[in-house]
Structure formats: C-alpha cells, structure tokens
Swiss-Prot record:
Occurrences of domain RNase H type-2 (ranges): 18-210
Record key words, sorted: Cytoplasm, Endonuclease, Hydrolase, Manganese, Metal-binding, Nuclease
Reactions catalysed, as given in the entry: Endonucleolytic cleavage to 5'-phosphomonoester
The protein's name: Ribonuclease HII
GO cellular component: cytoplasm; ribonuclease H2 complex
Family classification: Belongs to the RNase HII family.
Principal localisation: cytoplasm
A GO MF term: RNA binding
Amino acid sequence: MATYKSLTEADLLAFSTGLIAGVDEVGRGPLVGDVVTAAVILDPNKPISGLNDSKKLSEKRREALFDEICDKALCYHVGRASPAEIDELNILHATMLAMQRAVAGLNIAPELVLVDGNRSPIFVAHNGAGLTSHSIIKGDGLIASISAASIIAKVTRDREMDVLDAAYPQYGFAKHKGYPTKAHFEAIAEHGVFDQYRKSFKPVKALLEL
C-alpha cells in the first residue's frame, strides 16, 4: 500500500485501472455515536459535478449530492463501528474495521480501493478476493470517488445525530453532531452520558470516574 500526495500521481494511478472504490470516514472525533465510513464506486458514464470534500460543502449541497450519488453510482455501501467497538479497539482500529466493512459490503468487487488519508487497512471484497489499496492524502478533495464517499458518510452520520437529537434534545446533537464543543461538555456535565457515548474518550471517561 502506497500513500500519494499529488493529484498527478493519483490521476495516473486511477486511469491505469478499472473500477475504483473511494473510501472515507466521518466521526472519529465525536464523543458519541458510531464512526461511519462509506465506499463508493462511481459510474464513469454518469459523471457527477460538484463533488468535493464534504466539509467544504453546505448542508444543502451535501444533501443534494447524496441523492445524486445514490442514484448514479454503480454501487455504494456504508460501514460503521459502534461505540463499544471503539472502546474495545481504539478509534483508529475501529475506523479501519468500519472501512473494511464498507468495502466488503459493495456488491461489485473493485479493482482498486483509494482511501482518504495516510492509512489504509487490508481490504477483502464480498467474494473473498483480496484488493489492492492506496491512501491519498487529502483525497476527499482530489478523487471523485473519495469525495462521494465522504458525502455519503457525512450525510449518513449527520442524519443519525438528528435522530439522536430527537431522542435526547437536552444534549444538542443536531448542532454539534456529538463533537466536543463547550455546549456539549455543559450538557454532559448536567445530564450525564448514556450508552451511545464512547466511554474510552477522555472527557467521557473523566465524567464516569467522578
């Protein structure tokens, strides 16, 4: 597995292969909820304009692109790791596990997997075949399939935080999405934590030890 930093290298790599799955994650930093990943194989005959790192897009634009990706992609799959798995494995290894689940869930086996960042786990397709993978630093802004994966993962997790907000409105999940903000710290100090919290994360662990 190699790590690429430049768009030129990534483009040459991409153009030399067949079907490519882009993989990205969201939710490594929050104190609550799953870490969510997505794997997307785009259809080269159905281009999608405006793909970019999900963090650089407005919520409205992400939602529109989410629907377009779901409609036009050859296939996509969401993988996740639970708070319990995060606590057991640590957030890095749980994220790698979630990425593996996303790729294994694709109903088409890609020839190559491109992962955002500087790390990539070992991937196996749904048919048991091993897959070649490379990591692309800032790939979510460079490679269309990774951008698409970042959008699928981001919208999926944000929607889950909205559901959690409806169940626990006193925590403000719809606003901070579970990230460690001042308002979130104040909420857990007042109301405590529940089973969706990552108990190995320092702020949560400190509260439980009081």
